[in-house]
């Protein structure tokens, strides 16, 4: 099991999301069950990872590397260290707990759990990635689910819900309310979060490309870049 433990943790939520695509919205308990099982698999594997990690040995362990583009130096390179291991476990716990906390959701249940599973998997992928390309890929993958979860299933502030039009009618009774990006709406909060994340993502992308360009190694591999930095007497 330990040979593929990171793959179980990472791809169980993805597999659950794919399975939910083919599930029927008319069977909400089946939808919740699929989400819970996939999250449970990821949690059990994360617990195993947490206790199997050797803190005495330290460093990155349970490493997997799958070449994606040798020409560009891109690979699905996974591994965890003493910091990444508890973060992966925490993400799996939050996903599993989130499934049951949101058990009462009846509005577009299937879509909610699909995006929740994708968000969790992307977050876990960030903590596992030892390749800058995939680290950035998983980071960006988490942005869309966050926007949709906040914008569609989030909650407006009390002040926003009490807004009325010129005739004194509740604005939430109008169609325009759905697309209102006023300062107290959930859509505004979601959009603001995405803008902040995207702005910093551009800065991160520029940094990654500069590292790739000036390292001279033609690779996004974090471990290789770290060793190269040590040889160049660059603090890492």
Question: Where are these predicted regions, by residue range?
Answer:
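Alpha-helical multi-pass transmembrane bundles of energy-transducing inner-membrane proteins
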Residues: 26-28, 111, 115-118, 122-235
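Small-residue hotspots
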Residues: 17, 46, 207, 235-236
């Amino acid at each position: 099991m330990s040979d593929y433990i990171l793959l179980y943790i990472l791809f169980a939520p993805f597999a659950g999301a794919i399975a939910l695509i083919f599930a029927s919205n008319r069977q909400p308990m089946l939808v919740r069950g699929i989400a819970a099982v996939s999250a449970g698999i990821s949690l059990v594997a994360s617990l195993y990872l947490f206790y199997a990690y050797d803190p005495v040995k330290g460093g990155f362990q349970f490493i997997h590397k799958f070449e994606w583009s040798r020409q560009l130096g891109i690979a699905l390179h996974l591994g965890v260290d003493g910091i990444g291991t508890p973060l992966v476990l925490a993400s799996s716990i939050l996903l599993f707990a989130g499934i049951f906390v949101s058990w009462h959701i009846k509005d577009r249940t299937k879509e909610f759990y699909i995006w929740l599973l994708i968000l969790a998997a992307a977050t876990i992928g960030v903590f596992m990635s030892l390749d800058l390309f995939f680290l950035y890929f998983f980071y960006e993958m988490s942005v869309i689910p966050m926007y949709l979860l906040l914008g569609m299933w989030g909650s407006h502030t009390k002040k926003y819900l009490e807004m009325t039009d010129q005739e004194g009618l509740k604005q939430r009774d109008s169609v325009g309310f759905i697309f209102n990006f006023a300062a107290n709406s959930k859509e505004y909060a979601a959009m603001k979060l995405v803008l902040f994340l995207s702005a910093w993502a551009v800065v991160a992308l520029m940094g990654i490309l500069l590292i790739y360009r000036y390292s001279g190694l033609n690779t996004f591999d974090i471990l290789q870049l770290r060793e190269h930095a040590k040889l160049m007497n660059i603090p890492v």
